[in-house]
Curated annotation (Swiss-Prot):
The chain crosses the membrane at residues 1-21. Its main location: membrane. It is found in: Cell membrane. GO terms for cellular component: plasma membrane. Keywords: Cell membrane, Membrane, Transmembrane, Transmembrane helix. PANTHER family: UPF0729 PROTEIN C18ORF32. It comes from Caenorhabditis elegans. It comes from the Eukaryota. This is UPF0729 protein F18A11.3.
């Protein structure tokens, strides 16, 4: 049998977050809301590392003509279809 808190607490938490919390946040000062948000809604502190050669990749994207690779691929597929 499931204990009462295992059923009661999630239901009450959902009701609070859906209906009561929006009204409470309107009354609280913005400074308190900014303080409480990271506590109530924690996020992962791990940062994704950026690539070391990010500038080189961006320059290559800028220098490459638009759709250059797709036209070559379509020509190759048309030629292979003709050969078969």
């Amino acid at each position: 049998m499931v204990c009462l808190p295992c059923i009661f607490l999630p239901i009450m938490m959902a009701i609070y977050m859906k209906f009561i919390m929006p009204y409470v946040y309107r009354v609280l000062p913005q400074r308190w809301v900014n303080f409480l948000d990271p506590i109530l809604y924690p996020t992962c502190p791990v940062k994704i590392p950026e690539p070391e050669n990010k500038k080189e990749v961006e320059e290559e994207k800028k220098d490459a003509p638009c759709c250059a690779n797709t036209t070559e691929a379509t020509v190759e597929t048309v030629e292979t279809k003709k050969d078969q």
